[in-house]
Amino acid sequence: MPKSLALLAARVLSMPNFLRALVAFYCLSSAIATAQVGIDVSRISAEPSFEDFSEMSPSTALARSMTKVDDFTQRLPDDGDAASQRTEVYIGYDQEQLHVIFLAFDDNPNQIRANLSSRENIDGDDIVEMVIDTFNDQRAAFAFRSTPLGMQWDARWTEGSSMRAGFDTTLETVWESDGQVTDQGYMVKMAIPLRSLRFLDRPEQLWRIQFGRIIPRLSEESYWPPYLIDIEGRLNQTAPLTGIRNVSPGNNSQIVPF
């Protein structure tokens, strides 16, 4: 160990316990912030389909042109550990929509929980999730969830500790989802119309994003980037999203059929 690091370690160990805890918390927070790598989303030429991901792998030029995210980290039950099941996310956009494909691998696909249900009634099923802060202000975000059969749930997330913080499921917007269970796990496709979102009218967007997966039989939640219990707040743990250019925001006022 370098002498400077040895001296620093000795000083930390000589501190009272509460000061050591503060130093550890600061170092963890700094490490998370430093490791928070952003993604540059690809503009794609067509809407992706499950056929582009045959055998749960990007099998066409379109699929391979999308931006890939993986290496999810647990929040529950073991905060900070690697996810027990592999998840890959592929994201791209065109002039009208944001496109996302989830590949949720599972060692025991016959234990995946997936039920046909009404919109929003998906508690207890396996779930994949996308959270998007379209103003990059870490105050509020759109959230979209789907089950392995494509059953939808959407909400608005508000940051903070007030009574209004957390998910507001009164948000109802129009978007598309589909799902398919396979012998390796399941796939989910999301297509979010840009007119369903609110964002700044400027040539290039700077958003923040987070992907999640919930496996109820394992009581497991995992996320990319990590969404850790030891760090206060959620949207400050999202990743910067760049690359979306020359698109127009909508007014976010649509009628959702029942």
Language model: regions and residue ranges:
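Residue-level micro-sites within transmembrane alpha helices that shape
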Residues: 16-19, 125
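Structural preference for beta-rich elements and adjacent junctions enriched in aromatics
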Residues: 35-258
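Bacterial N-terminal signal peptides
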Residues: 20-30
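Intrinsic disorder/low-complexity segments in short proteins, especially the signal peptide
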Residues: 10-13, 27, 33
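N-terminal secretory signal peptides that target proteins for export/translocation
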Residues: 1-17
